[in-house]
UniProtKB/Swiss-Prot annotation:
Protein name as catalogued: Transcriptional repressor NrdR
Task performed by this protein: Negatively regulates transcription of bacterial ribonucleotide reductase nrd genes and operons by binding to NrdR-boxes.
Chain's gene name: nrdR
Cofactors that this protein relies on: Zn(2+)
Keyword Ribosomal protein: no
Domain of life, per lineage: Bacteria
Family per record: Belongs to the NrdR family.
Single Gene Ontology BP annotation: negative regulation of DNA-templated transcription
NCBIfam families assigned: transcriptional regulator NrdR (TIGR00244)
Cofactor note: Binds 1 zinc ion.
Keywords carried by this UniProt record: ATP-binding, DNA-binding, Metal-binding, Nucleotide-binding, Repressor, Transcription, Transcription regulation, Zinc, Zinc-finger
GO molecular function, one term: ATP binding
Span of the signal peptide: none
Length: 149
């Protein structure tokens, strides 16, 4: 690894620790030329499955699109950034765990709703109302009744 201070090629690892629930390695390094210390983080590059849209089109998984939907549902709700990050990580892990190269967009929507139900019931109803295209108040009531069971 190149030293960010002097660009020397030779560095040594002086400490390694697992972070982010074991999904990342934090390494403390020291340059052998200038003796400066710096930290690096390593994560496995995992390929997300492609998404099969309801119209049959296929497209790459768009994490930003998923995050946008979660954030809109959680807007002005008392949910921490850490809890949101964990939900995103959980959804991505479940998608990869399917072992499929392609997944239907409906699966992603259902995983998002599953996480929102845990994070915040109001956000869950917000997301479900758009995702399931609620037409009237009765459908809202039915979904709220399911939450209370």
């Amino acid at each position: 690894m190149h030293c960010p201070f002097c660009s020397e090629n030779d560095t040594k690892v002086i400490d390694s620790r697992l972070v982010a629930d074991g999904h990342q390695v934090r390494r403390r390094r020291q340059c052998l030329a200038c003796n400066e210390r710096f930290t690096t983080f390593e994560t496995a590059e995992l390929v997300m499955p492609r998404v099969i849209k309801s119209n049959g089109n296929r497209e790459p998984f768009d994490e930003e699109k998923m995050i946008g939907g979660l954030q809109r549902a959680l807007e002005k709700r008392p949910v921490s950034a850490d809890a949101i990050e964990l939900a995103i990580s959980t959804i991505k892990s479940k998608l990869r765990a399917t072992g499929e190269r392609e997944v239907p967009s409906k699966l992603i929507g259902n995983l998002v709703m599953e996480q929102l139900k845990v994070l915040d019931k109001v956000a869950y109803i917000r997301f479900a109302s758009v995702y399931r295209s609620f037409e009237d108040v009765r459908e809202f009531g039915e979904e709220i009744a399911k939450l209370q069971d």
